[in-house]
């Protein structure tokens, strides 16, 4: 299953000038919602991701995703493994666990996103789980944007990755796009204005 082809076929591999949730800019953006709007395809991707985690010997009880982008991917991963699913969400810009969700002491979690860039939102979710007595055994995503090392791939992680080095990240694909600070962005220097398509913008 070629993830890049899947994103292109779904119209989810976007080219333009994008403002990322990290406040950095990129010429490319992966709009996973366009892939996950197809329940059959979403299920197939989640089944494959679950098999990757299972084959690595990582056992978990539940899946937690940061809202909004990670919810569909995380729910489908939980379905694939017949696990419980919960999600965290931002309340006044602070990641929180609400809606009656609870975490049992020692409960093992995979934190699942649709896309991992630097892993900031996933790390925020992981900290909440651990503060409540849960155990984060790994991270998962449909796609990695090239900053974090993926356990089931041969890419090298970068210093900007925020995920802990002692916990594995599993993904179905690795996309390496150039990302720029607003001050260094060559697209801005041509007069182009970045648009914000991501989860924190709309």
Swiss-Prot record:
GO biological process, one term: pyrimidine nucleobase biosynthetic process
Entry annotated with the keyword Zinc-finger: no
Cross-referenced InterPro entries: OPRT (IPR023031), Orotate_PRibTrfase_bac (IPR006273), PRibTrfase_dom (IPR000836), PRTase-like (IPR029057)
UniProt keyword annotations, A-Z: Glycosyltransferase, Magnesium, Pyrimidine biosynthesis, Transferase
Pathway assigned to this chain's UniProt record: Pyrimidine metabolism; UMP biosynthesis via de novo pathway; UMP from orotate: step 1/2
Cofactor: Mg(2+)
Gene Ontology molecular function: any one: orotate phosphoribosyltransferase activity
Positions annotated to bind 5-phospho-alpha-D-ribose 1-diphosphate: 93, 113-121
Taxonomy, superkingdom: Bacteria
NCBIfam families: pyrE_Therm (TIGR01367)
Cited HAMAP family: PyrE
Family membership noted in the UniProt record: Belongs to the purine/pyrimidine phosphoribosyltransferase family. PyrE subfamily.
Function: Catalyzes the transfer of a ribosyl phosphate group from 5-phosphoribose 1-diphosphate to orotate, leading to the formation of orotidine monophosphate (OMP).
Designated name of the protein: Orotate phosphoribosyltransferase
Species of provenance: Campylobacter fetus subsp. fetus (strain 82-40)
Lineage: Bacteria, Pseudomonadati, Campylobacterota, Epsilonproteobacteria, Campylobacterales
Gene name per UniProt: pyrE
